[in-house]
């Protein structure tokens, strides 16, 4: 029977993580459990950075961005000896189960603890990239979307005033969900995402066609890591003679107070994680599909499940632009 649980946040931070921690802590306490927080993710677990959490520990955090527990990337966790020491930390505090909030890398860590040591782990999807399998939305995605959209709206104002071409680089790594949604909502003229690839010459031809038809400005939304956006801006400007500038939104997309959607989603997922543990589940990851909370085998989610591409949204954007 579960008596003590711990929660950690791992990898890149995302708005709403604090709300998820709050959900885990208060749901756990309501079940009579002792709840611990692990500072700085798996790195903190390795270095015994464990603190006890009470109701007041999570007061006034639901509206705060980031994660008050801290987060860190810890590639050393791939080492079996490092994982074994992390398990020793859990045993030291007699912690029975662990809730891990993060992305694919965080899930992989939970998967290894489950497979190798039988630790009851529950994964919650916390990343602005929306690239975790088994869920329609991840914690932080909607807030990051609003941040990106605000930037696009501001760029449109100045691009229109100066007949400028603006390139906006949006986070997402190898997933184009954030770029696609922000571009559709922001009315961007061109969208470049990993799922559809990038043909520079085709982009330049499309821009040329648009200006030949009377366009006076353009906004290009592109997912990070696909190309050097500043070099692309220089090439476009040299080709057309139109002033072209690139804006990299970067880590501003991770910060800021979470929106209502993310606060609610994170709270629901945090409470649901505790419910699953009380029902005897372990080695699961939580998601939301068709507005309902679901859970999947965490190993299956990592190795077999794939996120479907939002083809309908992409096709809609093509018709509008």
From Swiss-Prot:
Its cofactor is Mg(2+). Transmembrane segments: none annotated. The keyword ATP-binding applies. The keyword Kinase applies. PROSITE patterns: PHOSPHOFRUCTOKINASE. Pathway: Carbohydrate degradation; glycolysis; D-glyceraldehyde 3-phosphate and glycerone phosphate from D-glucose: step 3/4. Mg(2+) binds at residue 104. Its EC number is 2.7.1.11. It holds the Pfam family PFK. Substrate binds at residues 127-129, 164, 171-173, 224, 245, 251-254. Keywords: Allosteric enzyme, ATP-binding, Cytoplasm, Glycolysis, Kinase, Magnesium, Metal-binding, Nucleotide-binding, Transferase. It comes from the Bacteria. GO terms for molecular function: 6-phosphofructokinase activity; AMP binding; ATP binding; fructose-6-phosphate binding; identical protein binding; metal ion binding; monosaccharide binding. One of its GO terms (cellular component) is 6-phosphofructokinase complex. It catalyses: beta-D-fructose 6-phosphate + ATP = beta-D-fructose 1,6-bisphosphate + ADP + H(+). One of its GO terms (biological process) is canonical glycolysis. ADP binds at residues 22-26, 156, 187-189, 213, 215-217. ATP binds at residues 12, 73-74, 103-106. Belongs to the phosphofructokinase type A (PFKA) family. ATP-dependent PFK group I subfamily. Prokaryotic clade 'B1' sub-subfamily. Catalyzes the phosphorylation of D-fructose 6-phosphate to fructose 1,6-bisphosphate by ATP, the first committing step of glycolysis. Homotetramer. PANTHER family: ATP-DEPENDENT 6-PHOSPHOFRUCTOKINASE, PHOSPHOFRUCTOKINASE. This is ATP-dependent 6-phosphofructokinase. It comes from Glaesserella parasuis serovar 5 (strain SH0165).
